[in-house]
UniProtKB/Swiss-Prot annotation:
GO terms for biological process: carbohydrate derivative metabolic process; N-acetylmuramic acid catabolic process; negative regulation of DNA-templated transcription; regulation of carbohydrate catabolic process. It holds the Pfam family HTH_6. It comes from Shigella boydii serotype 4 (strain Sb227). Homotetramer. Pathway: Amino-sugar metabolism; N-acetylmuramate degradation [regulation]. Keywords: Carbohydrate metabolism, DNA-binding, Repressor, Transcription, Transcription regulation. This is HTH-type transcriptional regulator MurR. It comes from the Bacteria. Residues 37-56 bind DNA.
């Protein structure tokens, strides 16, 4: 029985929880070898029994049988299309239709958001927001896709009155880092946490007495060890993570939460500045 085909064709027959399971299995079929029903249940916010019933609805005796069958189908499909289909990103191949690609990308980003939010320590997050709010000066560092996330955060913080530097040039980033002072904050964004340029900036900032906040993955890394505070992000991307799609989604969820938290701390003044900024930019049209 081709379970992948059955899952794809039975969408209208699924309940809300069953559709969650179906989407997860389709988006993560290449990684099912290391997925248990317990992990799935926790990640999707449903019961393990729901997953077992879903497997039985498709004709399998239980989740283990369904999982092994899906792994086999995926492997056979890869072998069959290996000479023609290119692995484009995560579980997406060149044989996928745009509809399938859209569903896979959407689920991948949903998972990144769900997993990242599940890790939040809100007491620590509140402390981080308070530390940032009192900083005379904020530096944001990052490379590649992380730099884009940092730039977006810098614009948001400047809009509500914070003094922020977010330079693209790594030499300038290092120069700014060594000029930080006690009370200043450096926000270092790096999923790997091992980029030498970022580590150099963090070491310089710490030496000057600045507080370092890292937005990084759960993996042990130089950045994680050096930071005073860490905000964890989760991304399902592995060997194809260079395109950093779900990574940026996870990072943006963290930076947006920081921004809204800072607005909330000083809501009246912040909203006035946002309004003034909007009025000024409207005059440029």
């Amino acid at each position: 029985m081709l379970y992948l085909t059955k899952i794809s064709n039975a969408g209208s027959e699924f309940t809300e929880n069953e559709q969650k399971i179906a989407d997860f299995l389709q988006a993560n079929v290449s990684e099912l070898q290391s997925v248990s029903s317990r992990q799935m249940a926790k990640q999707l916010g449903i019961s393990q029994s729901s997953i077992v019933k879903f497997a039985q609805k498709l004709g399998a005796q239980g989740f283990t049988e369904l999982r092994m069958a899906l792994i086999g189908e995926y492997s056979a499909s890869r072998e069959k299309t290996n000479t023609t289909a290119l692995h484009l990103h995560s579980s997406i191949t060149s044989d996928d239709s745009l509809e399938v690609i859209a569903r896979k990308l959407n689920r991948e980003k949903e998972l990144a958001l769900e997993q990242t939010c599940a890790l939040f320590d809100y007491a620590r997050l509140q402390k981080i927001i308070e530390v940032i709010s009192k900083a005379p000066f904020i530096q944001i560092t990052g490379l590649g896709g992380s730099a884009l996330v940092g730039r977006d955060l810098s614009f948001k913080l400047m809009k509500i009155g914070y003094r922020v530097a977010c330079e693209a040039d790594t030499h300038v980033q290092a120069t700014v880092s060594q000029a930080l002072k006690k009370g200043d904050v450096q926000i270092a964004i790096s999923y790997s946490g091992s980029k030498k340029e970022i580590v150099l900036c963090v070491e310089a900032a710490r030496k000057q007495g600045a507080t370092v906040i890292a937005i990084t993955s759960l993996a042990d890394s130089p950045l994680r060890r050096l930071a005073h505070f860490t905000l964890d992000t989760v991304s399902g991307e592995t060997e194809w993570r260079s395109s950093s799609m779900s990574t940026r989604t996870a990072q943006n969820s963290v930076t947006d939460l920081l921004f809204v938290g800072l607005v909330q701390l000083n809501d009246v003044a912040s909203l006035k500045m946002i309004q003034r900024s909007s009025e000024l930019t409207q005059r440029l049209k």
